[in-house]
């Protein structure tokens, strides 16, 4: 028996699988963070005008480690290798027979506005509902005043401008407000425009305008956004609230799929370095990406694996998107990496995990 163990230890670097049980994908994924896999086949990513910048940032980071990689974005591609979507009408349709589908990143929505004397206001769910349904027609309405006692609210008419196709995070925000108020919400914009570029023309020029927008548009254009006051508690539209919401996740793992969804029954994770939790922002959606086709070298899968790395996820916030919570991210990386080369590591490290 001792000889067997001794021999096993001596041959671990070469025959680890013969002496240990199969290593779970989650464990392999955590070790894979230390390495960057590269593949040089052509990879076409179908994204959208909204996600193009954040995906391009991932490509640029990938190419710094893999200079021979050939990854490009084609938002009109008929036969892409990868599709990125939130499943709303504003984003591409997922490929019909995806080889694997996993979550990629989070997005959040809130109301944004432009109006003299309105900076820094808090809105109650009742006020948000009134603005979205058209019941509130002036910014000095009592439903807005009640959560802003130190403001002398201006007498400005409300103008609600919205794009034709809402994002999934916009719809999640509406559902959140609907749940809190216990009332249906049928949004009634004063003006509907085809795209964000047209919508943004009114911000900075039309006094009293507001819209419901996703975080990437808010961040890209430095728009003034609304925080919420719910049951006398402040809910802030900021990264700690986003992290709290992303930690409230149900993970759905199937044969070819690992995705996340908000579960408000899950206790939010505590803030880093503290024992407290931030109030979660439940206007959250998940962007998924699907592997539609690949080459013999797994070039598309390799790029997807790179986007699930912590360093790649960490730069999403610059573009108004946010990293997956760690348990989901590691499971995603493990699922994507199932057909990729096993990462090298010191076998002694395995005993410590």
Roles of regions detected by a PLM:
Residues 49-57, 164-182:
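Bilobed "Venus flytrap"/periplasmic-binding protein-like clamshell domains
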Residues 82, 87-89, 188-313, 317-353:
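Flexible, solvent-exposed loop/hinge segments that line or gate ligand/substrate-binding clefts
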Residues 106-108, 155-157, 284-288:
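Extracellular structured ligand-interaction cores
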Residues 2-10:
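Sec-dependent signal peptide recognition
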Residues 62-66, 87, 113-115, 132-140, ...:
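Sec/Tat-exported extracytoplasmic proteins
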Residues 20-148, 152-154, 186-221, 231, ...:
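N-terminal segment of the mature folded domain
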Residues 141, 149-176:
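Non-catalytic, conformational "gating/processing" segments within enzyme and secreted inhibitor domains
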Residues 13-18:
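C-terminal motif of bacterial Sec signal peptides marking the signal peptidase cleavage site
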């Amino acid at each position: 028996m001792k000889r067997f163990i001794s021999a096993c230890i001596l041959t671990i670097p070469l025959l680890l699988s013969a002496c240990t049980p199969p290593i779970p994908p989650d464990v392999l994924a955590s070790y894979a963070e230390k390495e960057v896999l590269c593949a040089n086949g052509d990879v076409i990513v179908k994204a959208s005008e909204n996600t193009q910048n954040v995906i391009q940032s991932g490509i640029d980071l990938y190419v710094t480690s893999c200079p021979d990689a050939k990854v490009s974005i084609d938002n009109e591609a008929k036969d892409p290798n990868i599709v990125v979507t939130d499943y709303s009408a504003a984003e591409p349709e997922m490929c019909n027979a995806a080889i694997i589908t996993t979550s990629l990143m989070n997005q959040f929505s809130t109301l944004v506005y432009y109006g003299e004397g309105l900076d820094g206001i808090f809105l109650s769910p009742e006020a948000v509902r009134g603005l979205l349904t058209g019941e509130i027609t002036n910014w000095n309405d009592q439903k807005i005043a009640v959560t802003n006692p130190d403001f002398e609210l201006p007498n400005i008419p409300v103008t609600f401008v919205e794009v034709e196709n809402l994002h999934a995070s916009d719809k999640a925000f509406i559902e959140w407000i609907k749940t809190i108020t216990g009332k249906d919400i049928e949004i009634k914009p004063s003006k509907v425009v085809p795209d964000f570029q047209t919508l943004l023309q009114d911000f900075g020029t039309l006094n009293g305008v507001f819209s419901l927008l996703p975080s990437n548009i808010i961040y890209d254009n430095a728009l003034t956004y609304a925080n919420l006051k719910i049951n006398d508690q402040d809910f802030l539209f900021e990264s700690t609230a986003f992290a709290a919401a992303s930690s409230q996740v149900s993970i759905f793992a199937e044969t070819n799929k690992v995705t996340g969804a908000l579960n408000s029954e899950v206790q939010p994770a505590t803030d880093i370095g503290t024992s407290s939790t931030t109030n979660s922002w439940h206007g959250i959606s998940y962007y998924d990406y699907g592997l539609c086709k690949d080459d013999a070298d797994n070039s598309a899968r390799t790029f997807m694996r790179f986007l699930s790395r912590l360093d790649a996820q960490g730069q999403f916030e610059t573009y108004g998107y946010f990293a997956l919570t760690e348990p989901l991210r590691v499971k995603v990386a493990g699922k994507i990496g199932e057909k990729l080369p096993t990462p090298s590591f010191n076998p002694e490290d395995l005993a410590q995990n």
